[in-house]
């Protein structure tokens, strides 16, 4: 893989609430449908790509900022082998909730989802690029980076935070199915057991689960295992131990699935 197509990750132990990623040439970078436990925001810095966000799919280009709330299924991929580049930030939702409620008495409300899935705001685009540059600057210590992050996400909140999400119809039995997967994803999870926990038939569960979570139960299970693997990699766990612990057949299977979801190998993601 050309060096330009290699993902670059940035993390700082003094700023555990934020992680950054950059791709300079995304022509050979392909994502499967996936979601994160954190809030994600990114900017297309050159070229264009497809942007799938739950039920919608469109082409976006340089200057576009994309936003994904925790749990929202998405994927960005190249358009017909055309070059494109981007930066991404992954932000702890609880930390972001503190920004959202810094000027009100809603400290106990938690993170409020952002309704916008993308924006052409030039201020947000420029602010995101500037924040990324400051985060990766080795000459800066943690304090100015933290201040820059607070300033940017306050700008995001002022720009987009007052819009409201369309309320989704939630089936509590389907929620119970997802909870069962979350509780047992480290072991063997069979569809029959999920159905029993949710008191739903297999046919209904598969249809209703995909409608609510934009993934099949199996895809949700694999995505949950990948989320766990990311956390373990950040903590320094070995790839072979993670593969065994998270229920993958072997290390090679884990490597393939991880790369399919995140367009990076576990070795590239690992600090």
Please place each PLM-identified region on the residue numbering.
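N-terminal regulatory/effector-sensing and dimerization cores
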Residues: 2-109
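Terminal helix-turn-helix DNA-binding modules in bacterial transcription factors
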Residues: 179-193, 200, 210-255, 271
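Short, basic/aromatic-enriched C-terminal tail that caps enzymatic domains
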Residues: 19-21, 256, 261-271
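Residue-level signal for well-ordered alpha-helical positions
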Residues: 79, 102-103, 159, 232, ...
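Short hydrophobic/aromatic patch on the recognition helix
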Residues: 63, 204-209, 253-254, 258
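Short, Lys/Arg-enriched, Trp-marked, Pro/Gly-tolerant hinge/linker segments that flank
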Residues: 107-123, 133-198, 211-223
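Histidine-centered active-site/metal-ligand motif
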Residues: 33-36, 74, 204, 218, ...
């Amino acid at each position: 893989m050309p060096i330009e197509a290699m993902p670059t990750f940035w993390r700082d132990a003094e700023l555990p609430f934020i992680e950054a990623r950059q791709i300079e040439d995304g022509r050979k970078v392909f994502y499967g449908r996936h979601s994160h436990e954190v809030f994600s925001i990114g900017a297309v810095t050159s070229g264009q790509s497809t942007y799938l966000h739950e039920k919608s799919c469109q082409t976006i280009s340089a200057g576009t900022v994309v936003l994904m709330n925790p749990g929202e299924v998405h994927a960005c991929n190249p358009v017909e082998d055309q070059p494109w580049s981007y930066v991404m930030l992954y932000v702890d939702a609880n930390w972001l909730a503190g920004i959202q409620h810094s000027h009100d008495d809603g400290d106990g409300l938690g993170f409020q989802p952002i309704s916008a899935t993308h924006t052409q705001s030039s201020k947000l685009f420029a602010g995101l690029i500037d924040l990324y540059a400051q985060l990766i600057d080795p000459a800066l210590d943690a304090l100015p980076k933290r201040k820059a992050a607070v300033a940017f996400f306050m700008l995001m909140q002022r720009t987009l935070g007052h819009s409201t999400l369309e309320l989704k119809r939630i089936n509590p039995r389907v929620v119970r199915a997802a909870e069962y997967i979350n509780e047992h994803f480290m072991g063997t999870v069979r569809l029959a057991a999920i159905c029993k926990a949710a008191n739903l038939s297999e046919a209904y569960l598969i249809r209703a689960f995909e409608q609510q979570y934009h993934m099949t139960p199996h895809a949700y299970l694999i995505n949950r295992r990948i989320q766990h693997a990311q956390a373990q990699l950040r903590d320094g766990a070995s790839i072979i131990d993670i593969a065994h612990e998270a229920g993958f057949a072997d290390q090679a299977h884990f490597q393939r699935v991880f790369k399919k979801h995140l367009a990076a190998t576990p070795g590239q993601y690992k600090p």
